[in-house]
């Protein structure tokens, strides 16, 4: 280095670019730090380098670390841990004073294998600068001079800026971490998670939360966009009741799409920290609250609780308000925080008031006797078919539901928005009372046969629908409000009075657990009633109710593909104890998967709430990286085209951050070249052929397999399910498979509309089918 900084240069260094680099470096160093002495230590390894530094008698700052990776036998592959481990050894071996000056921006790693081609294979910011070893000595010399001078200027002239920044941990980060860690949770609930997308003003808060969360074992979950953070948080809340902290930078309050409304509707508990600009800012860059707009009005209009934190002296008061809203179960609480608040330092003890942190006592909402009596009469003595559609159930609620269903002959159904709340396979046994799905789409042939006779709903006094923990939104059933109010008897159980539907004949305002316990205690079902109900359930057929699921035409029909996948899953579940979490995006593929595939537990459905295409796909990383079983995702080409690629997120968190996949992740991308549900609607209503508005162009990649550390990622084509090893595909551990499934559009089956129940392919055709055909002539 001393030679490089000297006046004389070898002939090979007499290059204008090198001379200019050297001149500008000396111009700065000679006047900024006159008399600067540079000392160079060379060693064969990072361990011996640390020993040599410790033996040095001089006090110094560690300005630059240059590593010859190939000469040291270190691998520069980002998914190989040898190089970071070696640098950690160097840091650990340095004296404390020098360790404090050892930084990523002053460490340069050179390796012959670090060619442009190898760098292009996978690029990620590293805790050092990676360079290909230049072929020309002057390029290496100039690069070293730039690195050295950059470090000196940053260390010395940047000290004033660093002195002005906060010293100590972020008060907001410490308070939120402490608050969430002190909230009681059931054993089955997931730990709260940190989700963030970086930004300048929130970078310090994120860094502190990242460190604190990692120290307590809370998952840190990244995503390719702000929207993906909300999708992942929603999925974890619905599947595992896991609270969350989402952190985004200023101006990003509108980047969560309709998923924010879904978080509100799900009563998801968590905080969304969104940076704000200083109050005095004039038309700020990426502003949130300023003269031109006030995002608080948008949040208020959406019914999203928020707290504006703009004074470091009043953070505790603002947090007390935020904690009260968290405990109120109104959905996520927005914290709009100015830079002064984000930069404020402090401890959780200083900010978290005991009365605000502890959740208030909440008595269970008991069922009233006058609400329970008509329900018990219906369950115990009326010879009625009973179908219960269940929302999300905890372990005790699930046990109560299944016990009541078995003892009272109650049919069970899950829904398009909450698939797997009840299911065919539970704890290794088949649930005889489960009749598959009831929903706006994806309603099963068994459910239809149970509720209908000769193509029409059975008489009102012969059956009743129970909706447990449901608002009975439009997506819950295929029936119109008129049908629900006039042709069906409805019992609805909800702990929120505002969710009780106007057409519920027996609205029960109570907690589900209290209701179920009361029903179970009052069970006294007449034997003849129980026998009749069980016979009614047994008479329904577990059938695809079409013929095209057997036809091996290419491209495949969705019916054919899902029938093969269903057979494989049934075998894996019943013979090998296979379990999985299903993730279902908005589209025909998600509908077909919900309707046709056996489930082993609750899944996440993009059909929930706003039914946003792409939500389910964006949630896959958060689900896959935090659950213990396999993950199967069903994503249409329309949904995939709307949102970012999740592959880098999965690879980064699994291979780089050590958040290993527990089992197998398979993402089925179902490609039929269009928005299939819209096309079915359009063709059914108008009889017209598909128009350009429903077309989706998919540019199919070749098949490939790549290794990233211990993680295998594959892309595979599935053109014929019968010729594909689906058994092997679903059981490859520590593997992410993106399977492009080539399909042809059709309008047949899968509960796409009530009219589909009159299609000619059904197992049984009611007279109504022929009457409608004759009337149309």
Summary of predicted features, one role per range:
Residues 168-210, 538-627, 775-777:
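Active-site diphosphate/adenylate-binding microenvironment
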Residues 71-73, 77-94, 227-230, 234-242, ...:
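Glycine-rich, anion-gripping cofactor-binding loops and their flanking helix/strand elements
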Residues 155-168, 217, 293, 299-302, ...:
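Conformationally flexible catalytic loops at phosphate/diphosphate-handling active centers
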Residues 148-172, 333, 480-585, 692, ...:
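Phosphate/pyrophosphate-binding active-site segments
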Residues 129, 242, 286-329, 444-451, ...:
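Conserved thiamine diphosphate
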Residues 215, 279-291, 422-425, 591-777:
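Thiamine diphosphate
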Residues 115, 119-123, 274-315, 339-341, ...:
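Glycine-rich, acidic loop regions that bind phosphate or pyrophosphate groups
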Residues 165-262:
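N-terminal cofactor/phosphate-binding cores enriched in small/glycine residues
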């Amino acid at each position: 280095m001393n030679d490089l900084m000297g006046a004389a240069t070898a002939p090979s260094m007499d290059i204008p670019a090198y001379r200019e680099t050297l001149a500008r470096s000396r111009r700065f160093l000679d006047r900024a730090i006159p008399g600067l002495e540079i000392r160079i230590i060379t060693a064969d390894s990072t361990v011996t380098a640390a020993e040599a530094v410790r033996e040095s008698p001089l006090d110094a700052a560690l300005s630059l670390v240059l590593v010859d990776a190939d000469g040291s036998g270190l691998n520069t592959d980002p998914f190989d841990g040898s190089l970071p481990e070696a640098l950690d050894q160097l840091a650990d071996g340095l004296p404390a004073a020098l360790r404090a000056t050892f930084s990523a921006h002053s460490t340069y790693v050179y390796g012959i294998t670090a060619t442009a081609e190898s760098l292009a294979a996978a690029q990620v910011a590293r805790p050092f600068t990676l360079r290909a070893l230049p072929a020309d000595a002057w390029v290496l010399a100039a690069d070293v001079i730039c690195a050295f001078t950059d470090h000196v200027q940053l260390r010395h002239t940047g000290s004033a800026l660093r002195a002005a920044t906060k010293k100590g941990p972020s008060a907001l980060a410490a308070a939120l971490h402490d608050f969430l860690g002190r909230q009681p949770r059931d054993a089955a609930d997931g730990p709260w998670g940190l989700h963030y997308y970086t930004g300048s003003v929130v970078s310090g808060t994120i860094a502190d939360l990242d460190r604190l969360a990692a120290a307590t074992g809370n998952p840190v979950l990244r995503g390719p966009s702000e929207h993906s953070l909300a999708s992942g948080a929603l999925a974890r809340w619905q599947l595992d009741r896991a609270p969350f902290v989402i952190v985004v930078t200023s101006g990003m309050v509108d980047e969560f799409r309709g998923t924010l409304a879904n978080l509100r509707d799900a009563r998801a508990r968590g905080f969304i920290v969104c940076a704000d600009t200083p109050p005095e800012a004039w038309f700020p860059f990426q502003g949130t609250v300023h003269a031109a707009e006030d995002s608080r009005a948008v949040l208020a209009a959406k019914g999203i609780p928020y707290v504006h934190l703009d004074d470091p002296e009043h953070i505790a008061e603002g947090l007390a308000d935020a904690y009260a809203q968290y405990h109120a179960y109104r959905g996520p609480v927005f914290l709009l925080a100015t830079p002064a608040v984000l930069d404020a330092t402090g401890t959780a003890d200083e900010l978290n008031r005991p009365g605000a942190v502890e959740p208030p006592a909440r008595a269970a909402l008991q069922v009233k006797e006058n609400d329970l009596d008509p329900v018990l009469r219906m369950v115990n003595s009326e010879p009625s078919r009973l179908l219960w559609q269940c929302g999300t159930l905890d372990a005790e609620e699930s046990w109560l539901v299944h016990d009541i269903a078995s003892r009272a002959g109650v049919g069970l159904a899950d829904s398009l928005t909450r698939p797997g709340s009840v299911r065919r396979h539970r704890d290794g046994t088949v649930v005889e009372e489960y009749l598959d799905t009831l929903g706006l789409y994806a309603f099963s042939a068994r459910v239809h046969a149970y509720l209908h006779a000769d193509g029409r709903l059975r008489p009102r006094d012969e059956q009743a629908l129970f909706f447990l923990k449901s608002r009975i939104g439009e997506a819950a059933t295929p029936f119109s409000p008129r049908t629900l109010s006039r042709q069906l008897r409805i019992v609805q159980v909800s702990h929120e009075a505002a969710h009780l539907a106007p057409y519920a004949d027996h609205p029960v305002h109570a907690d589900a657990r209290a209701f179920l316990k009361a029903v179970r205690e009052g069970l006294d079902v007449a034997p003849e009633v129980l026998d009749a109900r069980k016979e009614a359930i047994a008479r329904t057929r577990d059938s695809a109710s079409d013929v095209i699921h057997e036809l091996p035409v290419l491209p495949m029909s969705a019916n054919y593909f899902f029938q093969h996948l269903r057979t494989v899953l049934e075998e894996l579940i019943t013979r090998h104890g296979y379990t999985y979490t299903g993730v279902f995006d908005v589209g025909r593929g998600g509908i077909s998967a919900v309707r046709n595939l056996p489930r082993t537990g609750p899944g996440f459905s993009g059909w929930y709430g706003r039914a946003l295409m792409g939500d389910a796909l964006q949630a896959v990383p958060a689900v896959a990286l935090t659950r213990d079983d396999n993950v199967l995702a069903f994503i249409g080409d329309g949904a995939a085209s709307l949102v970012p690629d999740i592959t880098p997120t999965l690879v980064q968190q699994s291979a780089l951050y050590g958040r290993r996949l527990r089992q197998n992740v398979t993402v089925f991308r179902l490609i039929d070249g269009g928005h299939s549900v819209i096309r079915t609607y359009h063709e059914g209503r108008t009889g017209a052929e598909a128009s350009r508005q429903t077309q989706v162009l998919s540019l199919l990649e070749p098949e490939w397999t790549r290794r990233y550390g211990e993680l295998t990622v594959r892309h595979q084509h599935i053109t014929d399910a019968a010729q594909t090893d689906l058994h092997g595909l679903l059981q490859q551990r520590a593997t992410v498979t993106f399977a492009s499934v080539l399909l042809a559009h059709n309008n047949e089956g899968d509960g796409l509309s009530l009219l589909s129940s009159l299609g000619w392919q059904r197992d049984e055709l009611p007279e109504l089918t022929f009457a409608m055909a004759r009337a149309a002539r």
